[in-house]
From Swiss-Prot:
InterPro entries associated with the record: AAA+_ATPase (IPR003593), ATP-dep_Clp_protease_ClpX (IPR050052), ATPase_AAA_core (IPR003959), Clp_ATPase_C (IPR019489), Clp_protease_ATP-bd_su_ClpX (IPR004487), ClpX_bact (IPR046425), P-loop_NTPase (IPR027417), Znf_CppX_C4 (IPR010603)
Disulfide bonds: none
Organism, as annotated: Lachnospira eligens (strain ATCC 27750 / DSM 3376 / VPI C15-48 / C15-B4)
Cross-referenced SUPFAM superfamilies: Glucocorticoid receptor-like (DNA-binding domain), P-loop containing nucleoside triphosphate hydrolases
Protein name: ATP-dependent Clp protease ATP-binding subunit ClpX
Family membership: Belongs to the ClpX chaperone family.
Residue sites binding ATP per the record: P122, T123, G124, S125, G126, K127, T128, F129
Cross-referenced CDD domains: RecA-like_ClpX
Function: ATP-dependent specificity component of the Clp protease. It directs the protease to specific substrates. Can perform chaperone functions in the absence of ClpP.
Gene: clpX
Keyword ATP-binding: yes
This protein's GO CC annotations: HslUV protease complex
GO molecular-function terms, A-Z: ATP binding; ATP hydrolysis activity; ATP-dependent protein folding chaperone; protein dimerization activity; unfolded protein binding; zinc ion binding
Length: 422
């Protein structure tokens, strides 16, 4: 075997410089060499990477994120959200894993992928409220965005980057802090593809928006206009890394239960046959059986479904649950009104029949927990108008008749006389 030519100069295997062009050439196995200049470059790269990791850890530590165990997270949610036990468990685990991943990034050899969340549930079932309480518990910035306002770039409407601006604003323009926040995108079911068939018309608020959301959901350096609106060349943009932002997408997904039922081949023959009317309970049960293929059939593109691997199904709220929502949580609506009346030194009381009547109205309107406050506002608006001007009122009693509109709330006066509100 021929030996090395003695006139052949040794070279760095990385930059190809000869031994005469560098100060030092270090030999490795199998004739591999590296020069002092390449060693210095590699050292700088590693220092920069470690410094970035240290900076990120410093930001996370400085935020005082209150990371509790999944059981503790669920117990906290139990104080504010009635029912939805399975959904709370899934959310607790997903949120715990997300922030545990962030806090342990520099300690792991394996890169853990982010798991964004998709919540399925009828209007008023508590999707937004769950997300809000999670952010409050964790002490991280939180923003809510409406998917229906988003359009593809170049069309009238908001760019997807405007979602990130809301989070930056929630963090008081502290971008580092915003990069570890939570964004809840509501009405995500409204940006589904209008049809499985290719159309000649442009679907500017459907598939195109889903495509635009993919990068920020997965993790990218996005450029955000500081004042919102469309980006233009002269504008100075705010860069933000979305890698560690937790995205929770929610929607009512009206009609998804029919797709699930058709797949399961229950109560129907053939996919497009008419399906029987389902009760709210049946719909909730069907949502628990949703598979990625059902969501794709509904109109979410496969890539989008892949970016939201954690699917949480919320149950429809029955009248009993609505009654509990009115009375039991720490910040129950009735407790809020009682505190409000207390500021005017007036006691507020609801009869059991009145509470049931409010729950019944909301259930009939199919507005869920969201409709409870508007019903109470309409019942008590007149008396809330009168009370601040009449210091003799000591107590207000809301009856079933007051809720139904056939009578006014009862007022007790400091003279102990009981009269109807005039």
């Amino acid at each position: 075997m021929a030996g090395r030519n003695i006139d052949e100069k040794l070279r760095c295997s990385f930059c190809n410089k000869t031994q005469d062009q560098v100060k030092k050439l270090i030999a490795g196995h199998n004739g591999v060499y590296i020069c002092d200049e390449c060693v210095e470059i590699c050292s700088d790269i590693l220092d920069e990477e470690f410094e970035t990791e240290a900076d990120a850890k410093e930001v996370v530590d400085g935020m005082n994120i209150n990371l509790l165990k999944p059981k503790q997270i669920k117990e906290f949610l139990d104080d504010y959200v009635i029912g939805q036990d399975e959904a709370k468990k899934v959310l607790a685990v997903a949120v715990y894993n997300h922030y545990k991943r962030i806090m342990s990034q520099s300690d792991l050899d394996v890169e853990l992928q982010k798991s964004n969340i998709l919540m399925l549930g009828p209007t008023g079932s508590g999707k937004t409220f769950l997300a809000q309480n999670l952010a409050r518990l964790l002490n991280v910035p939180f923003a809510i965005a409406d998917a229906t306002t988003l359009t593809e770039a170049g069309y009238v409407g908001e760019d997807v980057e405007n979602i990130l601006l809301k989070l930056i604003q929630a963090a008081d323009y502290d971008v580092e802090k915003a990069q570890y926040g939570i964004i809840y995108i509501d009405e995500i079911d409204k940006i589904t593809k209008k049809s499985e068939n290719v159309s000649i018309t442009r679907d500017v608020s459907g598939e195109g928006v889903q495509q635009a959301l993919l990068k920020i959901l997965e993790g990218t350096i996005a450029s955000v206009p500081p004042q919102g609106g469309r980006k233009h060349p002269q504008q100075e943009l705010i860069p933000i890394d979305t890698t560690n932002i937790l995205f929770i997408c929610g929607g009512a997904f009206d009609g998804l239960e029919k797709i699930i039922e058709s797949r399961m081949d229950k109560s129907s023959i053939g996919f497009n046959s008419e399906l029987k009317e389902k009760s709210n309970d049946d719909v909730g049960e069907m949502f628990h059986k949703a598979l990625p293929q059902d969501l794709i059939k509904f109109g979410l593109i496969p890539e989008f479904v892949g970016r939201v691997p954690v699917v949480v199904s919320l149950d429809s709220l029955d009248e009993e649950a609505l009654v509990r929502i009115l009375k039991e949580p720490k910040n129950a609506i009735i407790k809020q009104y009682q505190a409000l009346f207390g500021l005017d030194e007036v006691a507020l009381e609801f009869t059991d029949e009145a509470v049931e009547a409010v729950a019944h109205k909301s259930f009939e309107r199919k507005t869920g927990a969201r409709g409870l406050r508007s019903i109470l506002e309409s019942v008590m608006n007149e008396v809330m108008y009168e009370i601040p001007s009449d210091e003799t009122i000591s107590k207000c009693i809301i009856t079933k008749e007051a809720v139904e509109g056939s009578a006014k709330p009862l007022l007790e006066y400091r003279t102990d006389a009981v009269k109807k509100a005039q």
